[in-house]
């Protein structure tokens, strides 16, 4: 009785396992281990033979599909039926129905192309034209203001025929230019004026550089050329902090009004 109960429970367990694996492996029942199920040892051997087929690690294909290679490379699958798959030159709204067919042709032609190099399309050794993906440039959002970063704006370099004279004219303000011209005119009136013109200009340039450096080191830089650099006193704090003299007529008016009211009440 115990053996019959054990064999019955084993047969029931095997039936459940085989029912679960019926759709997975058809050759498991046809193996030699599962032909004779009368003894317990044959039952365990059949279970061991069918157990690897029930593991979740092996793909579940009907028949012997796992032993055959795939007919199509899954990496070649391109979602050409979606409009965002490719951004080609032929993909435009005005193309209509012909644009979809051309896009599919581009997709089918570009399936066999390998990864593109970073430097762009290169000519092939056999002289053939590059594919549609090789000739396509990277999509850059230049029509947006954040698409292409704008570098620092550079001012144009001014080139003058007279080197030292025009450099000094650009470097110094108007009063320095007037002083330099006056000194040069005075030096030109002397007997050796034309001969010492170059030396005098060099000396004037050095002197003006020293004066500009001294003025720069005198105190903090004040933006007087801007309207907010140093506002007038009557405009500070929105005009509320004004002097007492400007309020004198208003105070006099109030005093006269108070005196008039007191005089009328006294009468």
Curated annotation (Swiss-Prot):
Ranges annotated as biased composition (Basic and acidic residues): 121-145, 222-237
Q: Write the record's keywords in alphabetical order, separated by commas.
A: Acetylation, Amidation, Cleavage on pair of basic residues, Disulfide bond, Endorphin, Glycoprotein, Hormone, Obesity, Phosphoprotein, Secreted, Signal
Question: Which InterPro entries does the record match to this protein?
Answer: Mcrtin_ACTH_cent, Melanocortin_N, Opioid_neuropept, PMOC, POMC-derived_peptides
One Pfam entry name: Op_neuropeptide
Tissue localization of expression is:
ACTH and MSH are produced by the pituitary gland.
**Where are the annotated segments for Disordered?**
88-175, 181-200, 222-241
Cysteine-cysteine disulfides: 28-50
Which biological process terms from the Gene Ontology are attached to this UniProt entry? calcium-mediated signaling; cell-cell signaling; cellular pigmentation; generation of precursor metabolites and energy; glucose homeostasis; negative regulation of tumor necrosis factor production; neuropeptide signaling pathway; positive regulation of adenylate cyclase-activating G protein-coupled receptor signaling pathway
Glutamic acid 1-amide carried by residues: 134
Q: Name one GO molecular function term.
A: signaling receptor binding
Signal peptide from the UniProt entry: 1-26
* Compartment(s) of residence: Secreted
The PTM entry states: Specific enzymatic cleavages at paired basic residues yield the different active peptides. O-glycosylated; reducing sugar is probably N-acetylgalactosamine.
SMART domains annotated for this entry? ACTH_domain, NPP, Op_neuropeptide
Q: Which residues carry this modification: Phenylalanine amide?
A: 87
Q: Residue positions of the PTM Valine amide?
A: 150
Location of Phosphoserine modifications: 168
Q: What is its main location?
A: secreted
Q: Which residues are glycosylated?
A: 71, 91
Highest taxon above the source species: Eukaryota
Q: Which GO terms describe its cellular component?
A: cytoplasm; extracellular region; extracellular space; secretory granule; secretory granule lumen
**Implicated disorder:** Obesity: A condition characterized by an increase of body weight beyond the limitation of skeletal and physical requirements, as the result of excessive accumulation of body fat. Obesity, early-onset, with adrenal insufficiency and red hair: An autosomal recessive disorder characterized by early-onset obesity due to severe hyperphagia, pigmentary abnormalities, mainly pale skin and red hair, and secondary hypocortisolism.
Q: Which protein is depicted?
A: Pro-opiomelanocortin
The scientific name of the source species is: Homo sapiens
Gene that codes for this? Answer: POMC
């Amino acid at each position: 009785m115990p053996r019959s109960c054990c064999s019955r429970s084993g047969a029931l367990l095997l039936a459940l396992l085989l029912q679960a694996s019926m759709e997975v492996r058809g050759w498991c029942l046809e193996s030699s281990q599962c032909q004779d199920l009368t003894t317990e040892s044959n039952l365990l051997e059949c279970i061991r033979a069918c157990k690897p087929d029930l593991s979740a690690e092996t793909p579940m294909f009907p028949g012997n599909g796992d032993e055959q290679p795939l007919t199509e490379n899954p990496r070649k699958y391109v979602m050409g039926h979606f409009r965002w798959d490719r951004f080609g030159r032929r993909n435009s709204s005005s193309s209509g129905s012909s644009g979809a067919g051309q896009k599919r042709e581009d997709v089918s032609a570009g399936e066999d192309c390998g990864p593109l190099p970073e430097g762009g399309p290169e000519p092939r050794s056999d002289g053939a034209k590059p594919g549609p993906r090789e000739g396509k440039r990277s999509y850059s959002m230049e029509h947006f203001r954040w698409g292409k970063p704008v570098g620092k704006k550079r001012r144009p370099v001014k080139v003058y025929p007279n080197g030292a004279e025009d450099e000094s004219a650009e470097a110094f303000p108007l009063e320095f230019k007037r002083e330099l011209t006056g000194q040069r005119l005075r030096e030109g009136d002397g007997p050796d004026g034309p001969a010492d013109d170059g030396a005098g200009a060099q000396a004037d340039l050095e002197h003006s550089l020293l004066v500009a450096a001294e003025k720069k080191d005198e105190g903090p830089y004040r933006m007087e050329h801007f309207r907010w650099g140093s506002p007038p006193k009557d405009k500070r704090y929105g005009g509320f902090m004004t002097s007492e003299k400007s309020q004198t007529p208003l105070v006099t008016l109030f005093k006269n009004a108070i005196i008039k009211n007191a005089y009328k009440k006294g009468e």
